Amino acid sequence: MNRSANPEAASSTSHVKFDLGKSVDISSTDTKDGGTARSPLEPADKSDTTESKSESGSDSRSEEDKESPASIKEIKAETPQPKDRPGVQIKLSWSQKIKSWTAKKKRKLYQLVIDIIMMNRVCKMFRQGLRGFREYQIIEPVHKKHPDFSFWDKKKQGRISFVTEDFAAQEGHFPPRAISITQKKPSWRTHQEIQDLCNILQALDCYRSYTESLQLLLAKVIRFERFGRRRVIVKKGQMGNSFYFIYLGTVAITEDEDGSSAFLDPHPTLLHRGGSFGEMGLLSTTVRSATVVCMEETEFLVVDREDFVANKLGDEVQKETQYRYNFFRNLDIFQSWSEEKLWKLVALGRIERFSYGQMVSKDFMNSAFITFICQGNCEILRLVALGDCSAYYKWVWQQLELLDHKPLRIHDNEISPKERFKELQIKSYPLQDFTYLKLLRLQKAREQQGIDFHGKINKVENTLPKLLGPKIKSRFGHLVKCSMVNTKFGELPKEAIVGVYMKIHKTEEGEIVGLHQAFVPEIQRDCRPFILLSLGSELIQVRKEKFYDMVDEETRAKIIKMDVDYPSDEDLCQSFLKENDYIVFRKDLLRLLVEPLNKSPFIPVQTKKKEIYNHKSLFLDLCSLEKKVKQHYPIFLAPQKYLPPLRVVQAISAPRHKIQELLPQYKNAGVLI
């Protein structure tokens, strides 16, 4: 029986010898027979040499130094071998180990450099790919330590908790807890869950228009759906089975079946968050007359036909339809229309609600819709580029004369013939005075008429034109050094190229917007863009081409008669400059009279809090054209079709005299004489 197989018979001692300066050698000693187990991977002759070398390992260090380099540089180690495998002997020279270690080190360093380069390239590719998303800030959801809070209720003798995450919605999406409620059957929803859904749906304008009892019924039967871009929700020619509320996203209404025209039409019929569609198809058995397609990822709240009929939601839809009919019937323009024709017009439009300050149309002149004002008011605005108006050009240089003391004609591009002739005279005879020639001619003319001329002219000294002497003082101020922009009237400072929104008209209930110059030849039309801004209104929008198909001669004559011309940009610019002069004068006067009285030396100066709005954002200061001061406030830019964005202002402060110089009664600050 082999004693090496018995773990107790194995040698309990192992000899490990390290000589870092020499070599590394690992060998195992056998028990009793002194034999060594040979590795099956080594030949027999090699095992013999290994035994002879292991015996010489017990010599002194001085003898090891004298031996050959192959057998000298070694470190011997004797370890017990497991019973299931023979002893293994590994011998490598020190030079080989150094080379292998250096190669491994270089290989790892090279691999590390390659990994770093690869990571940099990947990061660069991600940055280039995400260039379009720089406006958005990607925030990872942070785990909250205490996502809910609770308090003790004395009446119920229990703790009431409120979980904030159940009601949290990201980027306007439908809350997850609300989605889980809508996935239940209507009969399984509790009263509290229905009330929670009703509170969440208050964000939709069309939902708020219903009565409270009907809102609870809708919250009980409603279900949630989410569809991606280009998904057709309602197809033309099919039966309608559902009624949709738009919670998030945008849909388009088209005439084709696949909805592809919505992505090609420059002015598609769009419905946004808070809109609804599909209710008319549930009131009758007729097929759908239009296709509804998603323009982006959209979230819907859907009411099916059986729930729609069971909860008598059709009565509310009929009320809205009757409301539109009554509105159109009361307008003078439709008094001659028949009932059938008017009901067709009612089917073409739908009621939309816009909050205060919400833009209805960027350019209703080129829009595809006609807007009827049912309730509330709207404003018609015009963005006037002041740099394109001659009145503004003259006004700017008149104000800047206080800085450079140069007349307006110097900055003109075109010079009148009279001014051109004067310049020719000055260039031909520079710095010369011809006043004596006029006096001589005047004296001769009066002598011929027999009129005595008092005063004599020294002809000897004035035979030649005299040069301008030091008595004539030229008044030149410092030059205004700033970047200039060429306009059709001349040069203007770049900072002075601004725009202003001017209110043209305020609409009332019953007015129609979008029929301005509708039947005027296209060459004679006013193609300027006009903005329609809501002040809290309820509107009905109808497509122009469908409305024009229904217009008869009598209605056309009424439309032409009610047409009104809008003022030109030049008139709007002049009215703005007049109003601006009054605004600036009023501010200066209030500052002169009121501010000195409000100052108190005993009140410590308090640091102003940072605010979102800064009055300097909408204020242009022509006095600081030369000052290169970094602006610490935002400015508002309005996009233009073929030109760079235009800065929008509300007032312009120009160089001006002090009020004390113009009005002596305000000489002392805070005192009116």
Curated annotation (Swiss-Prot):
GO MF term list: cAMP binding
Source superkingdom: Eukaryota
GO BP, one annotated term: spermatogenesis
Name of the molecule in the record: Cyclic nucleotide-binding domain-containing protein 2
Listed InterPro entries: cNMP-bd_CS, cNMP-bd_dom, cNMP-bd_dom_sf, RmlC-like_jellyroll
Localisation per UniProt entry: Cytoplasm, Cytosol
Any Pfam family the entry gives: cNMP_binding
Function of the molecule: Essential for male fertility. Plays an important role in spermatogenesis and regulates sperm motility by controlling the development of the flagellar bending of sperm.
PANTHER family (alphabetical): CYCLIC NUCLEOTIDE-BINDING DOMAIN CONTAINING PROTEIN, CYCLIC NUCLEOTIDE-BINDING DOMAIN-CONTAINING PROTEIN 2
UniProt tissue specificity: Testis-specific. Exclusively expressed in testicular germ cells while it is not present in mature sperm (at protein level).
Parts of the chain that traverse the membrane: none
Keywords of the record: cAMP, cAMP-binding, Cytoplasm, Nucleotide-binding
